[in-house]
Amino acid sequence: MLQITPQMRILVAVEAVDFRKGIDSLAELCRAKLNTDPFSGCLFVFRSRRATSIKVLVYDGQGFWLATKRLSKGRFRWWPQGEEPARALRVHQAQVLLAAGNPDIDATPVWRPI
C-alpha cells in the first residue's frame, strides 16, 4: 500500500511531462532531469501539459508505485515555477496539492477537533 509519511521527501517536477510515460520513463526522468535516484524512496509528482492530471511515482523497497489523478473539472491551479528542475514540498503541502489546492496559500489543519 502506498503511504505518505512525514519523513518522506516529496519532489514536484517543475516542467510538465508527456503523460504517455510509464514507470521506466518517469524513473529515467528522475535521474536525468531531477538529479535524484528513483530508488531513494522519494515521492515524485509530475503534471500533464494541460494541468488536468498528475502522476505520483514512488519506490517502496519492493517495487514502484505509479498513481494518476485526473480532475473531472478544472485544472491544478498551482504549480511550481523557476529555474530549478523540482521543488520540495512537505507532506501537508502535498496533500493540498493533491486536492487541487495551492500549497503556498491554502492551509490544512494539523489536527481538527472532534
Where are the model-predicted features located?
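Polybasic/polar functional segments that serve as interface/processing modules
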Residues: M1-I114
